Swiss-Prot record:
<comment type="similarity">
    <text>Belongs to the intron maturase 2 family. MatK subfamily.</text>
</comment>
<dbReference type="Pfam" id="PF01348">
    <property type="entry name" value="Intron_maturas2"/>
</dbReference>
<dbReference type="GO" id="GO:0003723">
    <property type="term" value="F:RNA binding"/>
</dbReference>
<dbReference type="GO" id="GO:0008380">
    <property type="term" value="P:RNA splicing"/>
</dbReference>
<protein>
    <recommendedName>
        <fullName>Maturase K</fullName>
    </recommendedName>
</protein>
<dbReference type="InterPro" id="IPR024937">
    <property type="entry name" value="Domain_X"/>
</dbReference>
<dbReference type="GO" id="GO:0009507">
    <property type="term" value="C:chloroplast"/>
</dbReference>
<keyword id="KW-0150">Chloroplast</keyword>
<dbReference type="Pfam" id="PF01824">
    <property type="entry name" value="MatK_N"/>
</dbReference>
<keyword id="KW-0507">mRNA processing</keyword>
<dbReference type="GO" id="GO:0006397">
    <property type="term" value="P:mRNA processing"/>
</dbReference>
<keyword id="KW-0819">tRNA processing</keyword>
<dbReference type="GO" id="GO:0008033">
    <property type="term" value="P:tRNA processing"/>
</dbReference>
<keyword id="KW-0694">RNA-binding</keyword>
<keyword id="KW-0934">Plastid</keyword>
<dbReference type="InterPro" id="IPR024942">
    <property type="entry name" value="Maturase_MatK_N"/>
</dbReference>
<dbReference type="InterPro" id="IPR002866">
    <property type="entry name" value="Maturase_MatK"/>
</dbReference>
Length: 499
């Protein structure tokens, strides 16, 4: 029981009590528009300027209230419908100030926890490709998978309330609610989706912090239930989702069933359940029967409804067999297929044929959505036939080739983990031919004449680094080259793409 209390009680060192004064520091608004802001920069700049400037924020808030509400153009989409000012300048400045103010103490907490665990900060970063080797290792032994999309709160107040368990600063929350009320015009309990969408687009940093904190709060409860599931009875777990009385109910629940009903205490545990999330989408997979997967499904639904007041329809969370259905995650369609193999064994005069079936994870490129994206960017038509890019025809030959190469290499690096490379070859073909057609259009020539003049040197520019290395080590016709070239390659250094 002490272990539960130690896990569930909020660490007082994590409760930051004085965020309100940070709003009035001069350097906050300089840091807010530093796009390269990270934890190390925060640490370096915390002692930069200790002067308060109440006048700065007072002027911003005053100007927000002094905007002429009548001077609004119905056709001007860039104007704030409530404040009547182009691009929401003052609201964005204040929202960025809020974001930096709450980021600073939580960044300090993260760095201090890493230092206590003696973890180097740079090593804590993980590539998004590191998820797929985990899939390859674990998922062939699992049977069921559930594709779960974390629902958005219907009201921004829910996002604010999640901070109340960690930040004990009433003044900060009064100012925060005042700002959000003026921005979103909360006249009803439920805020329409368009206001959350507008708020997230115009204040991305602030909204992302609130949303990420909401996801962190949800996962902290969910992972607690996952790790301590052997203590939860199936028929009575619903009462555990009232956050205020969460700790007391856990304690009372365990004591009562331990002392009074030892014979009816029923443990359940699923040691083979796995949870993976990226942004707002998560994957839940298990080796056991679908019964336990259904229990976890309704745990999540009740958690969202009772604790975060977010409605999620049970019918939208499907539980599928990995061997029969594929799931979409991080740009890949993945499923588990049976890979039969036949081994012939001979002992003296007798020979035996042994059939062995192994499960293997398949990762497939979603070619149709990619072709739609390429068609939208005018690299091909909707059928996937390459076309020229007339917008780039005014650039130099080097710039045109470099742009196409950058896109091709980014897509090649990311989708080299595909188990079937046919779709990847098709994407490369579209980009190569689109590049050639763009160059031919610039020089007012045909594709055939242009290729005949340049030869095959232009096509070789589209070879990726690993293709060049393999071609130097092995002959192109060798079986080793073909096997390695068709194999899956995961790049564990991919964090973002060049824009």
């Amino acid at each position: 029981m002490e272990e539960f209390q130690a896990y569930l009680e909020l660490d007082r060192s994590r409760q930051h009590d004085f965020l309100y004064p940070l709003i009035f520091r001069e350097y906050i608004y300089a840091l807010a528009y530093d796009h390269g802001l990270n934890s190390s920069i925060l640490l370096e700049n915390l002692g930069y300027e200790n002067k308060y400037s109440l006048l700065i924020v007072k002027r911003l808030i005053t100007r927000m209230y002094q905007q002429n509400h009548l001077i609004i153009s119905a056709n001007d989409s860039n104007k704030n419908p409530f404040w009547g000012y182009n691009k929401n300048l003052y609201s964005q400045i204040i929202s960025e100030g809020f974001a930096v103010s709450v980021e600073i103490p939580f960044s300090l907490q993260l760095i201090s926890s890493l230092e206590e665990a003696e973890i180097i900060r740079s090593y804590n970063l993980r590539s998004i490709h590191s998820i797929f080797p985990f899939f390859e290792e674990k998922f062939p032994y699992l049977n069921y998978v559930s594709d779960v999309r974390i629902p958005y709160p219907i009201h921004l107040e829910i996002l604010v309330q999640t901070l109340r368990y960690w930040v004990k600063d009433a003044s900060f929350f009064h100012l925060l609610r005042l700002f959000l009320y003026e921005y979103c015009n909360w006249n009803s309990l439920i805020t329409q989706k368009k206001w959350i969408s507008t708020f997230s687009k115009r204040n991305p940093r602030f909204f992302l912090f609130l949303y990420n904190f909401y996801v962190c709060e949800y996962e902290s409860i969910f992972l607690f239930l996952r790790n301590k599931s052997s203590y939860l009875r199936l028929t009575s777990s619903g009462v555990l989702f009232e956050r205020i009385y969460f700790y007391a109910k856990i304690e009372h629940f365990v004591e009562v069933f331990d002392k009074d009903f030892p014979s009816t205490l029923w443990f359940f545990k699923d040691p083979f359940i796995h949870y993976v999330r990226y942004q707002g989408k998560s994957i839940l997979a298990s080796k056991n029967t679908p019964f336990l997967m259904k229990k976890w499904k309704y745990y999540l639904i009740h958690l969202w409804q009772c604790h975060f007041f977010v409605w999620s329809q049970p019918g939208k969370i499907h539980i599928n067999q990995l061997s029969e259905h594929s799931f979409y995650f991080l740009g890949y369609f993945s499923n588990v297929r049976l890979n039969p193999s036949v081994v012939r064994s001979q002992m003296l005069e007798n020979s035996f044929i042994i059939e062995n079936v192994m499960k293997k994870l398949d990762t497939i490129i979603p070619i149709i959505p990619i072709i739609r994206s390429l068609a939208k960017a005018r690299f091909c038509n909707v059928l996937g036939h390459p076309i020229s890019k007339p917008v780039w025809a005014d650039s130099s030959d080097f710039d045109i080739i470099d742009r196409f190469l950058l896109i091709c290499k980014n897509l090649s690096h990311y989708y080299n983990g595909s188990s079937k490379k046919k779709n990847l070859y098709r994407i490369k073909y579209i980009l190569r031919l689109s590049c050639i057609k763009t160059l031919a259009r610039k020089h007012k020539s045909t594709v055939r004449v242009f290729l005949k003049r340049l030869g095959s040197e232009l096509l070789e520019e589209f070879f990726t680094e690993e293709e060049e290395i393999l071609s130097l080590i092995f002959p192109r016709a060798s079986s080793t080259f073909q096997r390695l070239y068709r194999g899956r390659i995961w790049y564990l250094d991919i964090f973002y793409f060049h824009q």
